[in-house]
Amino acid sequence: MQSLLVFCLATIILSNFTEASADLETASQSLKHPRNLGWKAPEGHREKRYGGWGGGYPYGGYGGYGGGYGGGYGGGYGGGYGGRYGGNYGSSSWGSYSSYSSGGYSSYNSGFW
């Protein structure tokens, strides 16, 4: 009798975890899921920057962490942690997701920052 009760409880718990993981998998495949909002730019993987013109390869030209005009940790024209002309945590006039400025890609602010 006890083993039957343990078996039933284990079955219920496992079925709940299976349903929950299926829901998470469906949500993570959605195009609106925050993890899927990034895209790959031709010059390299586009990363979430901290404001400014950023984008492209880190430490090169524009962007990177603290390089050029592109934000980063405490530098540039846009945002960053204590950036000069932008806000905090990526809130600048160009949006939180910044991209390569000379490549014709516009900045994108998803509203998550």
Swiss-Prot record:
It comes from the Eukaryota. Residues 1-22 form the signal peptide. Keywords: Signal. This is Protein suex-1. It comes from Caenorhabditis elegans. The lineage of its organism: Eukaryota, Metazoa, Ecdysozoa, Nematoda, Chromadorea.
